[in-house]
Amino acid sequence: MPLSSRGFSAQLWALVGATFLGFLGIGTVLPMLAPHIRYDLKGTDQDVGLVIGIFSFVALAGRLISGPLADRRGRKISFLTGLGCCGLAGAIYLLPIGMAGPYLARIFQGMGEAFLYTGAASWVVEIAGVQRSGQALGYLSSGIWGGISAGPVLGQWVGTFARAAALQMLLAAVAFLVLTQVKEVYHPVPHHGPRTWLPPGILGPGIAIGFVNVQYPVIAGFLILHLKAHGNSGPAAFSAYAGTILLSRFFLGGLPDRIAPAITFFGGLSCMAVGLLLLASGPSPTLAIIAGGILGFGFSFPWTAVVSTVIRRTHSSKRGSSVGVLTAFYDLFVGVSSFTAGAVAHQWGYGAAFVMAALALVAAAIAGRYVFFGQAEVELPRVAATLPGR
């Protein structure tokens, strides 16, 4: 399916739509999961924490498996595997096996999310062409954030955990069927020599991505609690944060393709720092909403700037592995910073956790210097010539 000079093909939009459905299903179960464990299964608060947390560790392992699979067998098989795991997770939730159900389901959920995103991200870049990788990844991220944002609302609407789990299974099945109709043209390049877990040059970009995302568990865990004493503006500020990310990645995701990615990366970090420090100060409701929007706007750019830069330097036979490792850094840093933010907030208050996230951006900027100014895009001409639509 060729790609016109005026826009992206229906093939790419089908991938974005399937991604949206997959993440919509993931988000549908989330608001019901903790009450289901505590009240339906008579679990403890510790069970809730372990069930929620096991996802990140499984996803981390899944990134390292899904990348090589996407490179060797194709992007589609990774994507389909992810959707299949998400559907199985929904089915497992419905099994009458007690507390084993949520644990097992979250294992499949983490693996499914890892395979889904690795396959989708690698595939949309193949379709769009490396020169428009930033815009393609921006559209894909919009599908993810749209699903994550709408999922909890849908879950609350269906009313019960069993219905939410069944809906997750149904949405994954629909996305799976949609994806089977999308033709993939991918010919793996034979690889000579041993494969490594860390593709060359990936450490700097991974560290940059990791420190950028230290803010995410701070926002998810402490924004509402922190702002409760400052006009109770947490829900509105979070909506401004998430909504701005969704809109910015959809409409402005192509900026790293049109201007130097370093500009969008460091500009994004600057906006994030402003937003985090404003939130740390305990602002008024109006200023808190503005700060949430500024933070979300800034957060919209570093990921696409780094990933599109890495993709331009990476041969098509290694792109799946590179995307998988980059997202593994995300999982690692989010997991570690979740515990760190909790300890900081306990010791010095919620505002200190936001300051910690702002300081992490300094480390992200240092790593970014090596990402954007320390390596040339040596493989771009050779790679671009092999991509469809070029």
Where are these regions (language model features)?
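C-terminal membrane-cytosol helix-exit motif in multi-pass small-molecule transporters
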Residues: 169-188, 367-372
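Cytoplasmic helix-loop-helix junction between adjacent transmembrane helices
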Residues: 105-143, 308-309
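Extracytoplasmic gate region of multi-pass secondary transporters
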Residues: 30-31, 204-238
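Residue-level signature of mid-helix packing/kink "hotspots" within the transmembrane helices
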Residues: 56-64, 148-149, 242-250, 334-335
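Conserved MFS/SLC helix-loop-helix module at the cytosolic interface between two early adjacent transmembrane helices
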Residues: 61-97, 256
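Helix-breaking motifs and short loop linkers at transmembrane-helix boundaries and internal kinks
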Residues: 42, 74, 95-98, 260, ...
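Structural signature of the two symmetry-related core transmembrane helices
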Residues: 77-91, 263-278
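Helix-to-loop junctions at the C-terminal end of transmembrane segments
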Residues: 62-74, 159, 248-261, 345
